[in-house]
From Swiss-Prot:
Residues reported to bind ATP: T10, F11, H18, G89, L90, R91, E99, Y124, S125, F126, I127, S128, S129, S130
Family: Belongs to the bacterial CoaD family.
Amino acids binding substrate: T10, K42, L74, R88
Stated name of the protein: Phosphopantetheine adenylyltransferase
Pathway(s) where this gene product acts: Cofactor biosynthesis; coenzyme A biosynthesis; CoA from (R)-pantothenate: step 4/5
Assembly mode: Homohexamer.
């Protein structure tokens, strides 16, 4: 039996930290479904279709990856993908508090739902999409923070 997991997020934009978690999840699971959340409440920098396209570009060299947009409850999305496993990255203690609450909430909706927390490799532990956006919006170099495949998407945003 092949085991799938979901790695959900807004990926606005996808970072090297996200990519690190995806690669490490592939060492545990046969397939990783990268679930790009609509997240209108976050007022995304990129539209949903662009974020999906960026994730596909950033992961095109990896096998056993599927990129799918979703806008419903994560547990419902997981059921539709026939998996009960979700991967979440933890950078700091502050992430843990929030993720623990989400994990409990999801588990209350579906008792088979399992959240697996992965710490990023230390060199990526400070990277977040919001930090990348802030540096980018102030003209800083983000080339070491994001996959090279998405730099053209960011350059297009400058225009």
């Amino acid at each position: 039996m092949r085991t799938n997991c979901i790695y959900p997020g807004t990926f606005d934009p996808i970072t090297n930290g996200h990519l690190d978690v995806i690669k490490r999840a592939l060492r545990i699971f046969d397939n990783v479904i990268v679930a790009v959340a609509k997240s209108d409440n976050k007022k995304p920098f990129f539209e949903l279709d662009k974020r999906v396209e960026m994730v596909k570009e950033a992961t095109k060299s990896l096998e056993n990856i599927e990129v799918i947009a979703f806008e419903n409850l994560l547990v419902d999305f997981a059921k539709s993908q026939d998996t009960c496993f979700v991967i979440r990255g933890l950078r700091a203690v502050s992430d843990f508090e929030y993720e623990l609450q989400l994990g409990y909430a999801n588990r209350s909706l579906w008792d088979k739902f399992e959240t697996i927390y992965l710490m990023p490799t230390i060199k990526y532990s400070f990277i977040s999409s919001s930090i990348v956006r802030s540096i980018f919006e102030h003209g800083g170099d983000i080339s070491h923070l994001v996959p090279k495949e998405i730099l053209p998407f960011l350059e297009d945003k400058k225009c």
